[in-house]
A protein has these predicted regions:
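C-terminal recognition in membrane/secretory proteostasis and scaffolding
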Residues: 1-201
Length: 201
């Protein structure tokens, strides 16, 4: 989710963790730079796949200043998707059934792929595993085997609204993964915006 007025945005839907300890990595700030997705390691049962890519520029387009359990948050200098902005759905608007994810897979541009929202958990103690998503799109299944590392933060879209973002893949079934409610990420953005205003005043 991105606020077109302030440039504040949230990404990933989960935190960036230390690979050895699995603990959240501390972060003061960081640059946001463009990347190009150049290849895919296909996911299969018991072996997570991944997107491969490289930094396509060293010119920062924004900065990150929060790494939390529910994603990374920062501010963009210019919105890359301002003309394609979609409204955010409240969690009660999300329904089981057909949806799409918007993701980039080794061909340069983000594409829509069909998925099914299999289940919705409103009371889950984890705020990042609210939805179970099944990839049904034959093109995406052929390219990636389903959900792979690097797809975190891919928007989940239903009825013209952003309902969530992909957060995790099922280790034993790469066609399935979890998603976070977009509303949860927006709540975090609102808190960040309020803190920013308070600091400024």
């Amino acid at each position: 989710p991105n606020n077109p007025f302030s440039g504040l945005f949230g990404g990933l839907g989960h935190g960036i963790c230390d690979i050895d300890t699995n603990s959240l990595m501390p972060m003061k700030n960081g640059d946001i730079v463009p990347v190009t997705i150049s290849g895919v390691t296909k996911g299969q049962k018991g072996a997570s796949g991944e997107l491969r890519g490289y930094f396509s520029s060293n010119q920062a387009i924004g900065n990150l200043f929060i790494n939390s359990d529910e994603g990374v948050y920062g501010q963009l200098d210019v919105s890359p998707v301002e003309q394609q902005a979609l409204p955010v759905a409240m969690k009660q608007e999300v329904k089981e059934g057909p949806a799409q994810i918007l993701t980039t897979v080794a061909d340069g541009e983000p594409q829509y792929y069909n998925v099914t929202i299999e289940s919705i958990e409103y009371k889950n103690s984890s705020r990042v595993k609210n939805l179970v998503v099944l990839v049904t799109d034959e093109v995406l299944l052929e390219k990636t085997g389903g959900i792979v590392q690097g797809m975190s933060g891919s928007p989940i879209i239903q009825n013209g609204k952003i309902v969530g973002a992909v957060t995790h893949v099922f280790f034993n079934d790469p066609t399935r993964g979890y998603g976070i409610f977009a509303e949860n990420m927006v709540e975090n953005l609102v808190s960040i915006e309020q803190e920013t205003v308070q600091k400024a005043s």
